[in-house]
Structures are given as C-alpha cells and as structure tokens.
Amino acid sequence: MKNVLPPFIEIYRALIATPSISATEESLDQSNASLITLLAGWFSDLGFNVEVQPVPGTRNKFNMLASTGHGAGGLLLTGHTDTVPFDDGRWTRDPFTLTEHDNKLYGLGTADMKGFFAFILDALRDVDVTKLKKPLYILATADEETSMAGARYFSETTALRPDCAIIGEPTSLQPIRAHKGHISNVVRVLGQSGHSSDPARGVNAIELMHDAIGHIMQLRDSLKTRYHYEAFTVPYPTLNLGHIHGGDASNRICACCELHMDIRPLPGMTLNDLNGLLNDALAPVSERWPGRLTVAELHPPIPGYECPPDHQLVEVVEKLLGTKTDVVNYCTEAPFMQTLCPTLVLGPGSINQAHQPDEYLETRFIKPTRELITQVVHHFCWH
C-alpha cells in the first residue's frame, strides 16, 4: 500500500494549498468541496469506503466519512476541514503555501487542523485496512470554526456507534477529556424615541439596558458561587459582556440598545438550565417594561463535554502517552461526538497557534503523532 499515497509532506502541502475558510461573513466564507474531494480520493486509494454528505443550511459545505471493517464498535478519528479567515497584513508567509523553517511547518491549518488528516493518512499507508478486526472510521467535518454544523448534522443523523472517538485538535498531544460549553446571546431593549429636552415623552433604551446589565452581573456572581469544577483553571462558569450598542445622537432619547454576551458552562450544566437562569435574572426588567426586552441566540449553543475518567479510552491513551488527561476552557466538536461514543480531544500542534498569523506546527510532533495513531488503531481495531 505504501506507494499509493504521496509522501507525508506532499499530502500536507496539498491540504494547506486548498482553501477552506469558514466565516459568518458571506464574502469570506468558502466551500470545503475541493478539500473533501482530495481526502475522499486518498482514503479511497487506501481501501476505505467513502461517503460524502452535504451539510444542510451551509454554503456548499460537506462532511466526509471514510469507513472500513464490519461489525459493531471500532474507532472514529475525526477533525474539521475548515480554517478561520486570515489577516493578510499580519502574515509574513503565504498562508496557502506549506513552508518549513526552523523545525516548524507554516501555513493556515497546519495546527488547526488540516494537518491531522495528513498524519492519519501517513500512519495508515502501510496498513491493510481490509484485515482490521473492528471498524475504523475517519470523519472530516465542515464549519467547525463557525456553527459546528457538520458535527451537529453528523451526530444527529448517523447510526454509527463506535467504541470511542479521538478528535485531532491541537492539544500538544495532551489528551483532553472535558471542556466547557459556549452560549452566546443578544439582549435587545426597545425604547421609545423622542427629543432629549422632554425625557418623559420617551423611553430610554440605554437606561433600561443599564438596569438589565445590573441583573446580569448578579447572575454572573451567582454562577461563580453556585457551580464549581476544580479541574478547570477557571473552575466556574464565566459570563462575559462582549459588545454593546445603543442610540445615535446625544440629543435623542435612545430607542434601541443591543448587548452581546456569552456564558461558558461547565460540563453537566444543560443549555435549558442556563437559558432559564438568564431569563429569571432579567424577569424584573421584563415585568417592569412589558414587551421591551428580548433575548435571542447569536450562534447555536455548544454544550459542555466530559468523557468518563474511568473509560477504557482514557486508560489506554494515558498509558500510551505516559500522561494524565486534562480539561480545557475552549470548545471543540467533542460534545456532539460524545453523543455517539466516549470521546477524547488529542492531536499535534499547540492551541496557542490556532487562529494566529504565521500559524505553524512544530516538526517534533510528527514522529510521536504517527506512532500514536498507529497504536490506537492497533488497540481498538485489531484486538
């Protein structure tokens, strides 16, 4: 099988050279179809059955599932095909040209996280996948950097139930078994415009929002004292006020005001619970000013995630790597994969390079990542 695929570095180079930017702004958003076609071809060459799945509600985005083997269980290796947009003025290299310098591989997606697929392909090039005793699945998803639509759709529609899954996000090969969720909301206040010389003839939306923010701050303090998870560096749910806008002139009573905020819940906290807490916090304002305050989602929510610490996957990976699993504050697709099977987040490269100009992956990760993928495939698909 070894001559079927291009060399590792050429696979990497081709992945980086194929743009697949996800953005909420339509002018920046790109289809991942070309990248999916590349991956589908390579996994087909290795003997996998390949299914390409359009993702509803996206701008021409696709998931790809490559599978081999029969029966129940097995292993799912998964990652996203998209990258964030890049700031051309801050990059000193071409983001779409893989450049090796000073023991680093530079390019958009080298760490986050197109490179993971190059590692999978390279680790499997000498494996006769038709002889695996349990199924092996490779999932490439769309739109992780914006809506996570690909992972959401796959988890809602697939009948697959592997024994376990590994998401190859850049964790510096530190296995992650839990992370916080993310909920982003917009609070809107509708006032009544009027001339500032007669405040009684209007309803000032900024003043109502000031009242609302006071209640939101009380909720923030309550979250900090009521919920605790010691393993996290920030061991409580955080609440952040990120953006506010209201009014258009100093001599006009403000007619509308809008606040963008987010909450990062701990694993185990349900999205319904958090929505209820926010609505309860704002209830005094809503009752005093009926019909003038609304709360809506800015983006689809992401629940917190946790893999049981005593699961076989945790035990096996900790033994292979000689290190304990950890928890992180950022989000991945793990909550959606966890609905299918126990899931770890584990991959080459540093999260500190994600979304940064001159993104890179250190070459010191190449050998241990290849070895790790080989070992987990052997353990979960050969035994």
UniProtKB/Swiss-Prot annotation:
Q: What is this protein called?
A: Acetylornithine deacetylase
Which ranges of the sequence are coiled-coil?
Answer: none
**Species name:** Salmonella heidelberg (strain SL476)
Question: Does Lyase show up as a keyword for this record?
Answer: no
Q: Which cellular component, as a GO term, is one annotated location? A: cytoplasm
Please list the cofactors this protein needs. Answer: Zn(2+); Co(2+); glutathione
Q: Does the keyword Metal-binding apply?
A: yes
**UniProt GO BP:** L-arginine biosynthetic process
Subunit and interaction comment: Homodimer.
Q: For Zn(2+) 1, which residues are the binding ones?
A: H80, D112, E169
Reactions mediated catalytically: N(2)-acetyl-L-ornithine + H2O = L-ornithine + acetate
Q: Which InterPro entries match?
A: AcOrn-deacetyl, ArgE/DapE_CS, Bact_exopeptidase_dim_dom, Peptidase_M20, Peptidase_M20_dimer, Peptidase_M20A
By sequence similarity, the record places it as follows:
Belongs to the peptidase M20A family. ArgE subfamily.
Protein keywords: Amino-acid biosynthesis, Arginine biosynthesis, Cobalt, Cytoplasm, Hydrolase, Metal-binding, Zinc
As one GO molecular function, the record gives: acetylornithine deacetylase activity
Q: What class of enzyme is it?
A: hydrolase
CDD domains recorded: M20_ArgE
The places in or outside the cell where this protein is found are: Cytoplasm
Question: Record's PROSITE patterns?
Answer: ARGE_DAPE_CPG2_1, ARGE_DAPE_CPG2_2
Where primarily located? cytoplasm
Explain how, and how many, cofactor molecules are bound: Binds 2 Zn(2+) or Co(2+) ions per subunit.
State the EC number(s).
3.5.1.16
Q: What does this protein do?
A: Catalyzes the hydrolysis of the amide bond of N(2)-acetylated L-amino acids. Cleaves the acetyl group from N-acetyl-L-ornithine to form L-ornithine, an intermediate in L-arginine biosynthesis pathway, and a branchpoint in the synthesis of polyamines.
The protein's matches in NCBIfam families, at most eight in alphabetical order, are given as: AcOrn-deacetyl, PRK05111.1
Q: In which pathway does it act?
A: Amino-acid biosynthesis; L-arginine biosynthesis; L-ornithine from N(2)-acetyl-L-ornithine (linear): step 1/1
